[in-house]
Amino acid sequence: MEQIDDLQEQLVNFITTQVCIVDNNTFVLVANWYPKDKPETYEGAEKYPAKVISININTKTVGWTLYETGLLKSYTDGGYIDGKKIVLSSDLNANFCVFNYENGANGSEAPETHFAVRNIRLIGQHFYAVSSRRNIYRRNSKHNWEMISPIPHQLANPNNIATHAIDGFSESDMYMCGDSGDLWHYNGDIWKQLDPPCNWRMTFLICANNGMVYVGGEQDQLLAGKNGNWDEVITQELAFNKGYTAYDMTFFKDTLYIATGFSVYSLKENSWVSVDEISSRSTLECIDSNSDIMIIGGRDKITIFDGKKEEILYSDNSDLNKAKVVTSSIASIADDIRDAGDELLDTIQLMKPKK
């Protein structure tokens, strides 16, 4: 596959932080400003522009919209609602950007209730956003977000409040996960807290088309379940523990994949195995798929994988690769510190005496 000139141009001084497949011809990237002449200033990237870029690989055309501020941490998903193509992106502070493909980007969208975003997923006909303290929001329409979180008496353990991911087979069969083995199921009416056989930090969640629910951890731990039966496939003791961090996870053609930052791994016989067909280059941090194709994004590479071979959509072979790895690690550490601070504030809030 030849590289798209417009995409190369749009990514000058930008790095990819999120990828999304809308359909077989439409991919979306979130890209953060990265000044090649002054890479050391990347640590202040939240002050600078970011882009949501839509790519049509059939027509080789590129559309984009610009955020006024950067997206040091971004979340994106897209697909079709009522037959119309749509993409939603957000940063940690619920600064949403909607791309609806009829008139380009709708610009910023602010919900009536402010909340911190940890994950976005299009399930059925609605976007869902995960916030801290087990707060789940459903987007009913533009600017209209409805909270559908568990009510207080449903909380078997109210202290495990950091929530990280959501996914679902349908809008009446959804799961969410968070810290210390905090795992929940939603039947369209109420949330039920589950009791998995582990208590590590759950950061990724996939409801796969084989009927399985996969829950992953940052150190490559893995929990798998179906019909209420859960198996800790890869325990904390058996995880990599080699300095790798899992950044993203997807299920593609009957196989589970994770992006660790330096390589892509697939699950085979209850072990993570490097996918040699996907060449590593610096960082590979974001991954998404549908039934036909998988897209992997990194700081200097975007590639499409069909299960057998990769085709590079974008590549940057600049001398800044090593610097990007370092700043990526710094950004990841900063995100962890920010999350820990949010959790501490949540805990303090819960401890305050009621008036």
Description of each model-found segment:
Residues 28, 85-88, 127-129, 174-175, ...:
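Conserved beta-propeller blade signature
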Residues 13-20, 68-83, 113-125, 159-165, ...:
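Repeated scaffold domains used in trafficking and secretory/extracellular systems
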Residues 136-225:
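Solenoidal tandem-repeat scaffolds enriched in leucines and small polar residues
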Residues 5-48, 69-77:
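Beta-strand-rich domains and repeat architectures in extracellular enzymes and scaffolds
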Residues 148-159, 236-240, 317-351:
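Surface-exposed loop and turn segments in beta-propeller and other repeat-based domains
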Residues 8-11, 65-71, 109-113, 150-158, ...:
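Surface loop/turn motifs at the tips and blade-to-blade linkers of beta-strand repeat domains
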Residues 33-36, 50-51, 91-96, 133-136, ...:
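Loop/turn residues immediately N-terminal
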Residues 58, 100-104, 140-143, 186-190, ...:
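Short loop/turn segments that connect beta-strands within beta-propeller blades
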